[in-house]
Amino acid sequence: MTARPARWSPDSEPSARFPGLVDRYLRRAIPDPSRVPYRVRVTQRGRMRMKPGGRWMRFHATEDFQVRSVAFSWRARFTGPLSVLTAVDEYAAGTGRLRVRLLGVVPIATAGGPATARAQAQRYLSELFWAPHAIVGNPELRWRVLGEHAVEVSTMVAGSPVAVRIDFDDLGDISTVSTPARTRLVGSTAVDTAWAGRVSDFATIGGIRVPTRAEVGWQLPDGPFVYWQGHVTDIELRND
């Protein structure tokens, strides 16, 4: 039987488990600590492109975040003028994989292996703002203060740490997430590339306060390349 995630209360004393910046953030992000889920389901709409100057494709997606372990599953349906693509990006127990299919049947892209696992673990870390209960309940996370408005969160993948930097604004909300090295596929070659995401428009959805808009991109030699933009349409705290 899986243990229930740890409880946390905004009325409790500051926790030594994570930095003060994170503790203050949680006090706003989880207004009702009595609702403790096993996982958080986020529904998104947005657009994504594969290369600078490339055509944007609209998508609708659901993403499940585990609260007690570093694990997620993102399932998306992309629509374009000539085709429909489905994508599954997921990570659990140190293993990650990405699958893209045409019409949900014909495989057109796959990725896996150690580099993919590290990149997907970083994705989980960078999206903790959509599952704040995982900050409290996930024992696989480690925290380090980087400055007055920044922390680092890390986890282990195959015995080696992976980390993401989280920056907060003057109000105490998360504003950006970043890493100097995240795996980017260039053809069939994995290249470590600087990566960053920005979030905004905080609102309470499904009982938690989250950023409802986000965009992410690579920091390329020619300048930033934003490849994903999306907004949250629904959040469910689930115990199934």
Language-model features, listed with the residues they occupy:
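N-terminal leader/targeting segments and the immediate start of mature chains
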Residues: 1-41
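N-terminal trafficking/processing presequences and adjacent post-cleavage segments
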Residues: 1-12, 95-113
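N-terminal mature ectodomain segment of secretory-pathway/periplasmic proteins
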Residues: 24-105
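Short, solvent-exposed coil/turn segments at beta-strand boundaries
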Residues: 37, 62-75, 86-99, 146-149, ...
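Short, solvent-exposed secondary-structure boundary motifs
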Residues: 48-59, 73-82, 125-138, 153-159, ...
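Short, solvent-exposed aromatic-acidic interface loops
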Residues: 77-83, 101-107, 180-184, 216-221
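Flexible, processing/modification-adjacent segments and terminal tails
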Residues: 99-157, 190
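Gly/Pro-enriched, hydrophobic low-complexity segments
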Residues: 152-239
